[in-house]
Amino acid sequence: MNKNIKTTALSAAITMALGLSLNATAGGKGVSEVLDAVKNKANDVVESVVNSSLNDFASQFGEGNTEISIRKVKGDEADYSIITTQPLTSLGEDRARLFWQGSLGSYDQSGDRRTTLNLGLGNRWLIDDEKAIVGINSFYDYEFSSKHKRTSIGGEYKRSNVELNVNRYWAISDKHSVDGTDEEALDGYDAIFKGQLPYLPWANLVAKKYKWDRTNQDDVDGSYYGIEAYLTPETKLEVGKQDDNYMIRETYAKLTHSFGANSDHASLTDSAIATVAYQDGENMKNKMLNKVERSNKVVVEFGGITMSRTD
């Protein structure tokens, strides 16, 4: 906690203590009012300190967007990640912007905790009078302890009420032994769709289709679907079901907190029900540095038998 935060908290505490001592003799009613005021002041101080700390942390990454998330599938250990998307150029006259994206994740790989680095470059263009974004990107993925490597290319289309991302992945590391077990990163693809629910600008339907190529057994063919709800402009919760031909359908949940210049999404803190069905036609300029939607976890086959689950 920096010096300014400490000073603010100490000042607030002293002010509240003086308020109590001056008003305690005013009788039961006065004490009750003071206690309510103290509670409200304490809430304001805590909120201010937390927001200040998060903003200080986010400012270390630049003007783009940064988010932290935790994802849990029933029966598996949780996955954790931090992702930042930052500009390499300003918005040009051709309405294009070059950016980079980096992420670091801690993932459960069949009971083994592993860290993965993802680095990517992308270019996006504003089209349709700045009401839509189209983009292309390329990524490199590296799982540290196993040395699995993978590349990908992707394309995206975004509007204020709908978006579609399609990604193709290629393993560039060979099958090799990790702690006595033969492992192999897999090729594959995914397609991710998000669409606003009618009259609920703070909620999206999320659907993902994925397929991973296996050599000696049936390919992994699966999907997940759920609801993504913005609890605040910065915090969203996604809950749904994931299923493929190698797993039983299970419930998953993902909690994400974003911070940066563009954390301004409609949320439950606004009106719960909108007067129009879809929030279409909004300017997308401030969404040019939103993260690329993709699978950051390297999908691995273990001993030619078991599989890790996609994120």
Show the residue positions of the predicted features.
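Solvent-exposed loop/turn segments connecting transmembrane beta-strands
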Residues: 71-80, 105-117, 142-149, 183, ...
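Outer membrane beta-barrel translocator domains of Type V secretion systems
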Residues: 37-126, 131-143
